[in-house]
């Protein structure tokens, strides 16, 4: 009996202990499941909020300018032959923005909208400033790289007599062909276009040439824009002087009539000039200038006529 009672007690304790462990396991599983569900709900809410915020940005008035500012930064140091890739991505982004805008649902408070406006405006200013810094960086360092490349080419030519030409590699004169084997050893080029001494390609690659051409075009545009206002001012000044120096047709008719009447001695006296001032309404300086120019024109025509007459006599 005692053995049976002892065995039964052990079984009872075992049963009590086992029952308690099952309750703890189910409680832990429920807590973990609740935490996972809460995390999933929070992630879903955050994802939905991000989608709604993307829709707010897509319909914002500054959205197109922001995209243009981003693309402007990308275009600064992108080789010309790679620019179509940016255009293709830009076309895709346009469709994406339209999809965001199609699912737009206002959810921001007036205060949040003001904060979004301020953030986007500051972000666009940052991108514009960054683009200017990139342009300055590319211009300065591209010019330095080109100058350094020219110095290396000149040093190589001074040392070896080799002249680097685009597309043909190093060329030598016929007298130096015999020394070519000595140069092939240390100056041999690898299959990837880099020399084995570790100096890299001596001639600029297509991307480098494209970048150099881009920098040259940007500098040209910048110079034209810098001097544009000055050129327009000079042009306007020239046109103004031309308009100011051109006399009305009726006044020149009166002056020409006087000229034809006094063609033998086309030098008006002060009284003649005063009368012409009264008849034409011009200033004395304008009349003096017209007679000076008219005498020059007439002298030029007379000289041509006399030259033709002398040739005919011969």
UniProtKB/Swiss-Prot annotation:
Presence of keyword DNA-binding: yes
This protein's GO CC annotations: nucleus
Domain of life of the native organism: Eukaryota
PROSITE patterns named in the record: ELK (PS51213), HOMEOBOX_1 (PS00027), HOMEOBOX_2 (PS50071)
Coiled coil regions in record: none
Ranges for domain ELK: 218-238
PANTHER family xrefs: HOMEOBOX PROTEIN TRANSCRIPTION FACTORS
Official protein name in the record: Homeobox protein knotted-1-like 3
Species of origin: Oryza sativa subsp. japonica
Gene that produces this protein: HOS66
